[in-house]
């Protein structure tokens, strides 16, 4: 079995329940073809670089999984049939370097999934001393 990553963009006009149902259907497609889902990363609603049809935004979701290479054509065929998906891309990780990168991505996605929503990292903004002096005047 090889390691793969799928980025799918779901239509923004769907409700949260419909989006979740579509993501569950996508995961079912993968598992029904013998795949094992390693991690998933919901990236949320994002602005697209260019409009796809009449959509300027989309719900991005990444799925990391392992599956037999012969099943990829069927998985992609089922993705093409789904009218709720704006776009999808499948990335194959097969060299040792790529597999190492895939493992790191999976670990990062799993860590993000287990982190409570309230504990999101907040970066501290550092104001240079020169700017602080200007503000005081």
From Swiss-Prot:
CDD domains, A to Z: bS6
Name under which the protein is recorded: Small ribosomal subunit protein bS6
Annotated GO MF terms: small ribosomal subunit rRNA binding; structural constituent of ribosome
Matches recorded under InterPro entries: Ribosomal_bS6, Ribosomal_bS6_sf, Ribosomal_S6_plastid/chlpt, Transl_elong_EF1B/ribsomal_bS6
BP GO annotations: translation
Function: Binds together with bS18 to 16S ribosomal RNA.
Annotated organism of origin: Sulfurimonas denitrificans (strain ATCC 33889 / DSM 1251) (Thiomicrospira denitrificans (strain ATCC 33889 / DSM 1251))
Family (UniProt): Belongs to the bacterial ribosomal protein bS6 family.
Keywords assigned: Ribonucleoprotein, Ribosomal protein, RNA-binding, rRNA-binding
Alphabetized NCBIfam families for the sequence: S6
SUPFAM superfamilies: Ribosomal protein S6
Cellular component annotations (GO), alphabetically ordered: cytosolic small ribosomal subunit
Lineage of producing organism: Bacteria, Pseudomonadati, Campylobacterota, Epsilonproteobacteria, Campylobacterales
